[in-house]
Curated annotation (Swiss-Prot):
InterPro entries: Histone-fold, Histone_H2A/H2B/H3, Histone_H2B, HISTONE_H2B_site. There is a cross-link at K8, K9, K26, K27 (Glycyl lysine isopeptide (Lys-Gly) (interchain with G-Cter in SUMO)). It comes from the Eukaryota. Residues 1-49 are annotated as: Disordered. The modification N6-acetyllysine is found at K8, K9, K15, K26. Core component of nucleosome. Nucleosomes wrap and compact DNA into chromatin, limiting DNA accessibility to the cellular machineries which require DNA as a template. Histones thereby play a central role in transcription regulation, DNA repair, DNA replication and chromosomal stability. DNA accessibility is regulated via a complex set of post-translational modifications of histones, also called histone code, and nucleosome remodeling. This is Histone H2B. The keyword Zinc does not apply. GO terms for cellular component: nucleosome; nucleus. The gene is htb1. GO terms for molecular function: DNA binding; protein heterodimerization activity; structural constituent of chromatin. Monoubiquitinated by the ubc2-bre1 complex to form H2BK123ub1. H2BK123ub1 gives a specific tag for epigenetic transcriptional activation and is also prerequisite for H3K4me and H3K79me formation. H2BK123ub1 also modulates the formation of double-strand breaks during meiosis and is a prerequisite for DNA-damage checkpoint activation. CDD domains: HFD_H2B (cd22910). The lineage of its organism: Eukaryota, Fungi, Dikarya, Ascomycota, Pezizomycotina.
Amino acid sequence: MAPKAAEKKPSTGGKAPAGGKAPAEKKEAGKKTAAAASGDKKKRGKTRKETYSSYIYKVLKQVHPDTGISTRAMSILNSFVNDIFERVATEASKLAAYNKKSTISSREIQTSVRLILPGELAKHAVSEGTKAVTKYSSSAK
C-alpha cells in the first residue's frame, strides 16, 4: 500500500498543474523564454581573448621598470606579435612542405626567421631563440 501512496502523490502533484492548463501553459511559456534568454546569456558569456599583453608588460618592466604602457599601445604590440608569429608559422609551413616533411621543427622556424626578419634583427632573434630552446631542453631533463 505504501508504494501506491507514493505513486499517488506524484500523480496528484501532476494533476494539480493539469487542473489549470491555460494559466500553467502561459507561465511555462514565459518560463521557457526566460530560461532560453538566460541560457543565451550564459552561453554568450565573456569569450576569452588570448593576448600577449602580460608577457609584453613583463618585458617592459625588465627593460624600463618605471615606464607604463597605454591600452592602445599594448593592442598595437599585440597585433604586431600576432602578425610576426603568423608570418613565421606560414613560412615554416612552406619550408616543411618543400622538404616533404609533415613536422615543423626548430630548424624550419630558424630558417623562416632568417628569411622574414632583416639582417641584424634576424641574427639577434636566432640567438635568443637558440638560447631559449637550450634553456628549455636543459630544464626538461
